[in-house]
Amino acid sequence: MIIHPKVRGFICTTTHPLGCERNVLEQIAATRARGVRNDGPKKVLVIGASSGYGLASRITAAFGFGADTLGVFFEKPGTASKAGTAGWYNSAAFDKHAKAAGLYSKSINGDAFSDAARAQVIELIKTEMGGQVDLVVYSLASPVRKLPGSGEVKRSALKPIGQTYTATAIDTNKDTIIQASIEPASAQEIEETITVMGGQDWELWIDALEGAGVLADGARSVAFSYIGTEITWPIYWHGALGKAKVDLDRTAQRLNARLAKHGGGANVAVLKSVVTQASAAIPVMPLYISMVYKIMKEKGLHEGTIEQLDRLFRERLYRQDGQPAEVDEQNRLRLDDWELRDDVQDACKALWPQVTTENLFELTDYAGYKHEFLKLFGFGRTDVDYDADVATDVAFDCIELA
């Protein structure tokens, strides 16, 4: 079928299979350009592997270090008559090109919060991956979590705490500057956000993997977080989501103590602001990202997801000089270091009050933001003919959990 973008709110309801594949190829090329090393992870599990930082982790592990990878995600497959989600096509493209490079690649499509997903992962590690993994990447960003056992459903809330937050934002449907107000989260919403986006599920994964004996000696685990700056703190770090990320930090300390007994470790990696399906949903982020992209591009500091993950693997987790990774006082790996430079943030603060609907495209990189957003769904690429027919029914080596 012929597929063009249809954007509603912060979601594009259509996806382009070929565009998604080209995006993955672009990330593979960026990784390969930095050279392939053989002194890093060999067997990698990525939980939340189909888009954003999770996908970039999988690409970096496979094409930067020659690792075998197992990816878990929750996506909709395409059929002959309907396109699937972007994450499905990203994962299909990854699988195709990893196999072409002679690398082991297997995927599981299902609820990554479920015990069934953990059981399936453990079975595959035992039967197909040599029995153990040496890196576990935890990269789930979900609005909903169904608790294993009880089946109770918890929902996360993108809300401030204590008082209504009002700030300048972009109406991304109309490309206009508006005042956005968000009501504060209730105590229950804060609690549920911690349950969905905190460290509980990460710990359940490590419990299960360790209990089954499928974690290698020296195995590491990393989970992703975002702290941001005072511009975004009210809605993020000081909001319900921030409380969940504090829980993630506490979980990392516990897991690190456990894994360190066998020569490994666990860290939270704090990453920079990038255009992802997760960040597009957070009010104020599109405007902040549009500003910080412009400033960082001008300073030669800009990074996308794959550049961030390359730096995380090559300069933090698996340093060639054999030294331990540089961490902050909470044992976090900081990849938001360039974004948080004083010169970058001072420029952002000076720019923020000046932005209007009329000068939005001129003062910020909102055009770049829109382009990156469409790219998430396979659109906006110059090397794809969007008026040509494309097959939407793309199958690959993926186990479907019932």
Curated annotation (Swiss-Prot):
NAD(+) binds at residues 48-53, 74-75, 111-112, 140-141, 245, 274-276. Changing Y53F: 50-fold decrease of catalytic efficiency. Restores fatty acid synthesis in the E.coli fabI mutant. Changing T276A: Loss of reductase activity. Restores fatty acid synthesis in the E.coli fabI mutant. GO terms for molecular function: enoyl-[acyl-carrier-protein] reductase (NADH) activity; NAD binding; trans-2-enoyl-CoA reductase (NADH) activity. Pathway: Lipid metabolism; fatty acid biosynthesis. Keywords: Fatty acid biosynthesis, Fatty acid metabolism, Lipid biosynthesis, Lipid metabolism, NAD, Oxidoreductase. Changing Y236A: Loss of reductase activity. It is not able to restore fatty acid synthesis in the E.coli fabI mutant. Disulfide bonds: none annotated. Changing K245A: Loss of reductase activity. It is not able to restore fatty acid synthesis in the E.coli fabI mutant. Changing S50A: Same reductase activity as the wild-type. Restores fatty acid synthesis in the E.coli fabI mutant. Pfam families: Eno-Rase_FAD_bd, Eno-Rase_NADH_b, Enoyl_reductase. Changing D111A: Loss of reductase activity. It is not able to restore fatty acid synthesis in the E.coli fabI mutant. Substrate binds at Y226. It catalyses: a 2,3-saturated acyl-[ACP] + NAD(+) = a (2E)-enoyl-[ACP] + NADH + H(+); a 2,3-saturated acyl-CoA + NAD(+) = a (2E)-enoyl-CoA + NADH + H(+). The active site is at Y236 (proton donor). It comes from the Bacteria. The record marks E75 as: Plays an important role in discriminating NADH against NADPH. It is an enzyme of class 1 (oxidoreductase). Its EC number is 1.3.1.9, 1.3.1.44. GO terms for biological process: fatty acid biosynthetic process. Monomer. Belongs to the TER reductase family. Involved in the final reduction of the elongation cycle of fatty acid synthesis (FAS II). Catalyzes the reduction of a carbon-carbon double bond in an enoyl moiety that is covalently linked to an acyl carrier protein (ACP). It can also use crotonyl-CoA. This is Enoyl-[acyl-carrier-protein] reductase [NADH]. It comes from Xanthomonas oryzae pv. oryzae (strain MAFF 311018).
